[in-house]
């Protein structure tokens, strides 16, 4: 009897070989991140602004320091001037010049103001009545002044307007030798701005100068320094 052979078809499903279906386009390759580098010009703008700001601050500080220094220096000058004042009373005039830093110009009481100076004339009844030229200069110096110095006709006319015609007054002009005239203030002697009487100066032995009135009017005359005369003192106005 012939044996029967049964054949069976066996299919083994290999999942590893199973097909995979993708939908859509293939995935694009991943891009590398890019670094955003700042341009040099973008950094220059804030740096320049910072430098300008620092410069403005420096200038402001410098200006403030200069103003403070000027004010402080002015304060020290005023303090020194007030400390050096030997006069108890002052007559002051308010300055009207807009550019004038100090607002008051002062002269001691009983002194006459003219221009930028104050003038004091000795009287017969005053403490400093009549004295030699050197004594007169010392008297003026003790009051913070010196003997009169004249550099213009306007000043000469002002002085003669407050003097007594019957008196003579020493001024701060003297002969240092060989007709070398000098002012006590050390300002230059200008021969073209002098007011000598006619024929004066007349003697090498007369080395000091007075201002007096003759028939021809007011003028200068040289006399011996030891003679006793009245005098005129002069000082700069006190600025407050």
From Swiss-Prot:
InterPro entries: C-type_lectin-like, C-type_lectin-like/link_sf, C-type_lectin/snaclec_domain, C-type_lectin_CS, CD209-like_CTLD, CTDL_fold
GO molecular function: calcium ion binding; carbohydrate binding; D-mannose binding; pattern recognition receptor activity
Motif ITIM motif per record, residues: 5-10
TM annotation in the entry: 49-69
Residue numbers binding Ca(2+) 2: 200, 202, 206, 221-222
Residues engaged in binding alpha-D-mannopyranose: 200-202, 206
Membrane topology recorded in Swiss-Prot or TrEMBL: Single-pass type II membrane protein
Positions bound to N-acetyl-D-glucosamine: 211-213
Principal subcellular localization: membrane
Ranges of the Extracellular topological domain: 70-240
GO term, biological process aspect, one: antigen processing and presentation of exogenous peptide antigen via MHC class I
Presence of keyword DNA-binding: no
Short name of any one Pfam family annotated for the protein: Lectin_C
Any Gene Ontology CC annotation: external side of plasma membrane
Cytoplasmic side: 1-48
Compartments where found: Cell membrane
Glycosylation sites: 190
SUPFAM superfamilies: C-type lectin-like
Alphabetically ordered keywords of this record: Adaptive immunity, Calcium, Cell membrane, Disulfide bond, Glycoprotein, Immunity, Innate immunity, Lectin, Membrane, Metal-binding, Signal-anchor, Transmembrane, Transmembrane helix
Domain notes: Contains 1 copy of a cytoplasmic motif that is referred to as the immunoreceptor tyrosine-based inhibitor motif (ITIM). This motif is involved in modulation of cellular responses. The phosphorylated ITIM motif can bind the SH2 domain of several SH2-containing phosphatases.
Oligomer status and interactors: May interact with PTPN6 via its ITIM site.
Function in brief: C-type lectin receptor that binds carbohydrates mannose and fucose but also weakly interacts with N-acetylglucosamine (GlcNAc) in a Ca(2+)-dependent manner. Involved in regulating immune reactivity. Once triggered by antigen, it is internalized by clathrin-dependent endocytosis and delivers its antigenic cargo into the antigen presentation pathway resulting in cross-priming of CD8(+) T cells. This cross-presentation and cross-priming are enhanced by TLR7 and TLR8 agonists with increased expansion of the CD8(+) T cells, high production of IFNG and TNF with reduced levels of IL4, IL5 and IL13.
Listed name of the protein: C-type lectin domain family 4 member A
Lineage, broadest ranks: Eukaryota, Metazoa, Chordata, Craniata, Vertebrata
Gene coding for it: Clec4a
